[in-house]
Amino acid sequence: MGLDIYAGTLTRYYSHNWKTVVQQWAEENGYSFNRITPDGEPADDEELSPTDVQAAVENWRDQILAAISQPDQPPYAPWPENNEKPYYTDKPDWDAFGAMLLVAACRTYEEPVPPTVEKDWIFGEHPLIARLASDEERVWSLFRGATWWLPLTDSFLFQGPLPTDDTVAIATLGGLRKELERLNQLAWQADEDTILGWADTEGYPVDGTVDSDGQYSKADIPEHTQYDTQSLAKFAFSMFWRAMRFAEEQQVPILLDY
């Protein structure tokens, strides 16, 4: 089960009016593609109309913003919802997301960063990641299981219901920016152009090739069972930074799709 990051309106997301980078690649290269949900079933195409989705999402948005608004402070302004605004998406997958957390945890506690991580590793069980996830003096939404970040400048984290009634950890763009800036300062001190480029220059090693006939082949390429920790961390970090910048500019949420 892969991990995609999405920045865009919730109306587009719940109307399925967006395509993962794998879907986009498949269509461009003439392949069929079926999304599989976390329970192993094909994604359900039965859906409300975009108009109905937008109404439901706006109702949810207004209730959430009312619930988290602070006494004696102006209420939070609702972000715009529609089915047309552009979106950003990319695919860090779990190993790179975990590598990013590992670098953050190692740098936070001044421990050496392991040079490699295992393919399909259970990153939440790493002692330093687990330590930072429960550190009451250092609360990072990325370590507390947040999967949604709302387009608000204030920093906070709360458990709340989604429009689907599932309960998840929800944070804010303002908080995510502080966390990403903190991680960059701890680990790399890279300028923004460098950060934005990592999604194209770092990441997973090649496990196969596509020949001139469009056929995918793993011939002559050994399967990788270990990955470079820093390269994967930079790869995921770049995608989160890109999503954050896009979400700030467009005033849309970020969410993790898996």
Question: Which functions belong to the PLM regions below?
Answer:
Residues 1-242, 246, 258:
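Acidic (Asp/Glu-rich) sequence patches and key acidic residues
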Residues 248-253:
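Short helix-adjacent coil turns
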